Amino acid sequence: MMLKNDFNVLGQIAWLWANSPMHRNWSVSLLMKNVIPAIENDQYLLLVDDGFPIAYCSWAKLTLESEARYVKDTNSLKIDDWNAGDRIWIIDWIAPFGDSSLLYKHMRQRFPYDIGRAIRIYPSKKDTGKIIYLKGGKITKKVAEKTFLQYEQELITALQ
């Protein structure tokens, strides 16, 4: 259940969606489906500068099964999927005012020893996504690469 402050957060995130060239034409129902679970599970980071929201990121902690569904259909996440596993997926990354590097820095601090993945959608190819990998600020490149490879192999097997 959302609390009073959660509605303020929701409004700030909605404002960022409205200012994002990629998100602004997405439906309100998609905003609710992607944002409310993040707020309810405290799985988001909202950067604010001088009282104004400047960037937002949300993540889900998926199981291998929900991850396989998500890769096939990014609209497949259910509320129970958001905090069901240990496989971190970035759901939204919104920085419409050029603060993506700052958001990345904060996320690396938030998850210093973790790795995560995201489906990167390019504005010119809206129907095509690419899985990208992110690593925490204190995890070694060697450990991250080993974990990425393991997760990739497990996902390939799950998708078959």
UniProtKB/Swiss-Prot annotation:
One of its GO terms (cellular component) is cytoplasm. Transmembrane segments: none annotated. Keywords: Acyltransferase, Cytolysis, Cytoplasm, Hemolysis, Transferase. It is an enzyme of class 2 (transferase). It comes from the Bacteria. It catalyses: a fatty acyl-[ACP] + L-lysyl-[protein] = N(6)-(fatty acyl)-L-lysyl-[protein] + holo-[ACP] + H(+). GO terms for molecular function: acyltransferase activity. InterPro entries: RTX_toxin-activating_protC_bac. Its main location: cytoplasm. One of its GO terms (biological process) is toxin metabolic process. It is found in: Cytoplasm. Its EC number is 2.3.1.-. The active site is at residues 23, 92. Homodimer. Protein-lysine acyltransferase that catalyzes fatty acylation of the protoxin, thereby converting it to the active toxin. Belongs to the RTX toxin acyltransferase family. This is RTX-II toxin-activating lysine-acyltransferase ApxIIC. It comes from Actinobacillus pleuropneumoniae (Haemophilus pleuropneumoniae).
